[in-house]
Amino acid sequence: MAAAVLSNKGATVKGLEIRVSSSGTSGWHIGQGAHPTSQLVWEKAGYQHHHVASQFKANDYFVNDYILVMDSSNYENVLALASCEADRAKVFYLRSFDPALHHIDPNSGDYFKLEVPDPYNQSEDAYREVLAMIESAVDGFIERVIQDRDA
């Protein structure tokens, strides 16, 4: 869902090119499409996106400027694949870009407040709540990308 939001919102910013890829840290769903409820919710919100699941690999550090994770398990798994400090510096919780949460240190005891809950097989309302979290964070992330580009 985050990839759908980021790719669509990023495409609306003139002069900004954001290429989005989405992957998990396990191989459970490699090659599968998005969960039907997730896709339904993002399409109802006006986002278009085609998703095929893939697994995060250490090589992804070489082709991405930012690595955004949804939860602490993914945060730890992605950091474990980092080969250097420059790789680790690319890793962020997506919600750390939410203006209401940007003050939270991901290495503090409050890290859990930065997690995006997985609504898998829950109600459509749960997916909509997650979409709202993602939208707020993506807006903040796009602002950060623009700041970094203009620095």
Each model region followed by its residue ranges:
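Phosphate-binding/catalytic loops
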Residues: 72, 77-151
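Conserved active-site segments centered on acidic
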Residues: 1-64, 143-150
